[in-house]
């Protein structure tokens, strides 16, 4: 019998499973199987990954699944702000890491509103060689500070990690369309999400593995049931092989939307999306600099998808003045790198196909509001 709602699954079966109602795409359906295969193929292509796992929930779920799979020994964390502090929060709350070592971002100068830079790479490399961790965790883009790690910094981290037998784990949740090539940078585990760089609804953590990462996965066991990364990799493998499997319920409809958004990004061109992301981010940073607004990110480390700037105005910090003009921004948050109580910022997110396909229009809309909130 045909599906009661053909728009959900045009060639689907009449729904009498114990998992879904007629209003959701069934995880056993042919349509969802193709969605999973398409997701795997696109993610492997874009990130030069060897394997893919999808962990239901969101980016933090992906982070914790990776931590509970690979972080039970000695974890070294590059902390560039509040959302890489999240690695420490995961380890501290779970109590499963034998030891953690942290390398923190720091001010690049002594000004009252200093720009921040990641810890010097030579210092981090030396710390890796000294501590000999089992895994190194770093943020590609730090959402609280607007800091991005350049490819050569990531490559140096990976080289040092591999020299001591450690995995290199890179959080790309806030990377936007700045795709990281795992093969070129030596990254073993890369974490992304649907709702930022991929213009889809939040639903899962997307975990990509290099060959080395896949080998380590096969030889380790998670200490979580729901976040068992090896199990979620096996689920994806079942779909890749033309079948299906179940561990916990997948967000099927949201993953269908993610697949469609990936296809739209592919039609735009992954390189074109990346170039538009840089153009947009650089232009927004210039717009703010012309008004005397200071960036939290030091030159050379300024992310194009997240622009974080200083403000002394509490109604700019909390976003109220922007909301009054029709724009939703993100409030400033601490960095957790000993920045002091006076630290006060506001954050602009520049994610999504609608912005990247119309950089000029996006800049014009934002400029109209910035002119009112922060006059030149």
Region spans (language model):
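Conserved N-terminal alpha-helix of the aminotransferase class I/II PLP-enzyme fold
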Residues: 17-62, 69, 80, 86, ...
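PLP-dependent aminotransferase-like
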Residues: 61, 71-134
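Internal helical hairpin/lid segments
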Residues: 74-77, 250-320
